[in-house]
Amino acid sequence: MSRLWGGRFRKETDPLVEEFHSSLSFDRRLYAYDIRGSIAHARMLGRVGIISAEEARTLEAGLYAVLDDFNAGRVAFSPEDEDIHSLVERLLIARVGEVGKKLHTARSRNDQVALDVRMYLKDEIDAVRELLAELQHTLLDLAERHIETLLPGYTHLQRAQPVTLAHHLLAYVEMFHRDAERLADCRRRTDVLPLGAGALAGTVFPIDREYTAAELGFAALAENSLDAVSDRDFAVEFCAAAALIMVHLSRFCEELVLWSTAEFGFAEMDDAFATGSSMMPQKKNPDMAELIRGKSGRVFGDLQALLAMLKGLPLAYNKDMQEDKEALFDAVDTVKKCLMVFTAMIGTVSFREQAMDRAVRGGFTNATDLADYLAGRGVPFREAHEIVGEIVLYALETGKTLEELTLEEYRRFSAAVGEDVYAAIRVEHCLAARKVHGGPAPETVRAAIARARKRLERV
């Protein structure tokens, strides 16, 4: 088979090189984008008179026929096809004859592949953002059912202050909202047409890049031909955004793994999202949460692979850039799969409200409120903090909770304590008093859920 670039060479390529050089095993997923881009390019060539209108129609019909063959699974892949671009061109020429060789006029594989990857990534960004929206809806539905469900908030994995399960879930809604915003920003920078840049220096033909951009739905044109073919920032940006999505999923999964232990007992995974042990019959393992947590490392690796690949490249295109696709494709596939599994899983988790309630009431989570109570009675907060620390130590030594201490015991530490202290340190009061925007008070959480739902309507 003749090569797209074979005229310069006397010797055949070494078979080992052919295998090493080929990207068809992974870039074949771009076939629909490659064909769509070629159809738009053929139309443009005919529109401006670089080829005849009849030739343009022949190319377009041939390309649609090739697309049908791909969709129907009728394409036979050859080891001699270097990549999806050369395969599509070979199939087109076999179908329409010599006119097929005119398709590549005013185009290089350098701007062609940049186009394909951008088109692919725009669609995948939209798909990931939709999955993020579905996850946020699921979390909001869950939060709505748990506005009053007490949960200890933690710092350093030590019980800290009372919150609610709804408030905790809303923290992740905010993370996934930021993820969606990052992807929207990435999409804007991906939505730039590189076609027309040629190999690196544009073309002498009077092409109409604006027409091609409109045909393919691009918002802008690449402003510099060198940058157009060498830019993979958009792929790096996506992988960085995907890595953060995986960080957020991994953190949530870590909590689910912890909460599902007997030591915490806050949650139980549904049977459909857990597995057992081949040896220990009592086990119910949160394997899906652990797998998502583990797969985060893959996406971090994909990001690092892209950065390492790009860091030493001179302008413009270099063969190293063929390595962008496997990392990008893996990041896309992994984050989509993890989002789908996590959304299905989190909606089935059983939360143990009594265990959470006991943990809130048994860990001095209302100590800060006791300090605030003293500060409200004129005791300087730093002094109030010291006093409450001493009270907690005393309660630990006597085996009591703050609610179980007598007024006489309290007054050994501060005369500012009155009978109303017991109302002030009730966990329910501690929550209800935190009505600040973004706080865990039930009425504040209800408003936050409503705002988050409204925000999702605009996505």
UniProtKB/Swiss-Prot annotation:
Localization: Cytoplasm
Sorted UniProt keywords: Amino-acid biosynthesis, Arginine biosynthesis, Cytoplasm, Lyase
GO CC annotations, alphabetized: cytosol
Stretches of the chain forming a coiled coil according to its record: none
UniProt cross-references to InterPro entries, sorted A to Z: Arg_succ_lyase_C, Argininosuccinate_lyase, Fumarase/histidase_N, Fumarate_lyase_CS, Fumarate_lyase_fam, Fumarate_lyase_N, L-Aspartase-like
E.C. number(s) listed in UniProt: 4.3.2.1
GO terms (BP aspect): arginine biosynthetic process via ornithine; L-arginine biosynthetic process
Main subcellular location: cytoplasm
Main enzyme class: lyase
GO MF annotation terms: argininosuccinate lyase activity
Top-rank lineage group of the source organism: Bacteria
Protein's name according to its UniProt entry: Argininosuccinate lyase
Organism: Desulforudis audaxviator (strain MP104C)
